[in-house]
Swiss-Prot record:
Organism encoding this protein: Acidithiobacillus ferrooxidans (strain ATCC 23270 / DSM 14882 / CIP 104768 / NCIMB 8455) (Ferrobacillus ferrooxidans (strain ATCC 23270))
InterPro entries, sorted: MnmA-like (IPR004506), MnmA-like_C (IPR046885), MnmA-like_central (IPR046884), MnmA-like_central_sf (IPR023382), Rossmann-like_a/b/a_fold (IPR014729)
This protein's name: tRNA-specific 2-thiouridylase MnmA
EC number: 2.8.1.13
Source species taxonomy: Bacteria, Pseudomonadati, Pseudomonadota, Acidithiobacillia, Acidithiobacillales
Chain's gene name: mnmA
Main function: Catalyzes the 2-thiolation of uridine at the wobble position (U34) of tRNA, leading to the formation of s(2)U34.
Length: 352
């Protein structure tokens, strides 16, 4: 039956391996797939592919590697570079889910007659009177719903997140019980195409950007306080690299790449109460003009904070926080929840 055929996206890690095991236990006819997203010489993905292939061999399911390097470069990596050039701090994992991963894998599944796609994300799904809802993973320490805010609402009913109701210890225990070779494999922590975490070196080596473009360091009134080595070295909230010469610590308040300026100020100037969003995506029925009480995550690891969500148009919204938020960073995602349910979110454009 077509509704029992599914693709399982395999990263080579323990979460997707256990997701495959659980889907198989539910009677799904699976095909394992891994997306090759970056040149072999620049990202350590070969071991992950070997691990994914071994998982499929253990489970007795077919496995294939899909080449999406060009699409990934165009839709994710080049946007990553452009965002830094524009003075923003990008979130490539959410962008990849938004523009590439889920839609592409569902399309690949259709070629094989598979209507469902399963992944190892820590998130949950629930059926409601208005359709399928996306919920936070039960293990809030591992919850990955933040990265899924921008996927299409129309595909939720075709997704499965088998480990979303488990915690990490339970996942590893199940992998050990069933003899999966990745039971103790360490989780990946960095951006997949910047495996050493040094984004500055990546911008220099991959994009050929000149990181040494000295400019003025100014305060919020425009007074010149000194000079900086280049805006690409900084992000909002950063203290390191600003030099001394002040009785009070200075922090980056904003970047102005057009004028090659870094705007700095004291700790108290980092706080903002109003955040404007663009490219919004909502996973439930919300309409322009509406206002909703929500909790918001401004970064993946941040705590969800109370705010009022004002919907300005289909693609634009404004958040007014109960308490001012520290170092709100343009280019990052603001993701909105009501209780456990993810409503959606948008990309941070500006603050007040």
């Amino acid at each position: 039956m077509a509704d029992k055929k599914a693709l399982i996206a395999l990263s080579g890690g323990v979460d997707s391996a256990v997701a495959a095991l659980l889907m198989q236990g539910q009677g799904y006819e699976l095909t394992g797939v891994t997306m090759r997203l970056w040149p072999r010489s620049r990202c350590c993905d070969e071991k992950d592919i070997e691990d994914a292939a071994e998982i499929c061999a253990r489970l007795g399911i077919p496995y294939t590697v899909l080449d999406y390097r060009e699409a990934f470069r165009r839709q994710v990596v080049d946007v990553f570079v452009a965002e830094y050039q524009a003075g923003r701090t990008p979130n490539p994992c959410a962008r990849c889910n938004q523009f590439l991963k889920f839609d592409a894998l569902l399309a690949e599944g259709e070629k094989l007659g598979a209507t469902m796609l399963a992944t190892g994300h820590y998130a949950r799904l629930a059926e409601t009177s208005s359709g399928t809802a996306l919920l936070r993973g039960r293990d809030h320490a591992k919850d990955q719903s933040y990265f899924l805010f921008a996927i299409g609402a129309g595909i939720l009913s075709r997704l499965r997140f088998p480990v979303g109701g488990m915690n990490k210890d339970e996942v590893r225990a199940m992998a050990r019980k069933h003899g999966l070779p990745v039971a103790a494999k360490q989780d990946s922590q960095d951006i997949c195409f910047v495996p050493d975490g040094d984004y500055r070196r990546f911008l220099e080596d991959y994009a050929g950007l000149d990181m040494a473009q000295e400019g003025e360091m100014v305060d919020s009134s425009g007074q010149v306080l000194g000079h900086h080595p280049g805006t690409l070295h900084f992000t909002v909230g950063q203290r390191k690299g600003l030099g001394g010469g002040s009785d009070q610590p200075r922090y980056v308040l904003a970047l102005d790449p057009a004028q090659n300026r870094v705007i700095v100020g004291g700790e108290d100037e980092l706080y903002r109460g109003v955040v404007s969003l663009a490219e919004c995506n909502w996973l439930t029925d919300l309409s322009p003009g509406e206002t909703h009480a929500v909790t918001v995550k401004l970064r993946y690891r941040s705590r969800a904070e109370s705010a009022m969500l004002h919907l300005l148009s289909d693609a634009r919204a404004e958040l007014r926080f109960r308490e001012p938020q520290r170092a709100v960073t343009p280019g990052q995602a603001a993701v909105c929840y009501q209780g456990e349910r993810l409503l959606g979110g948008g990309w941070i454009q500006g603050t007040e």
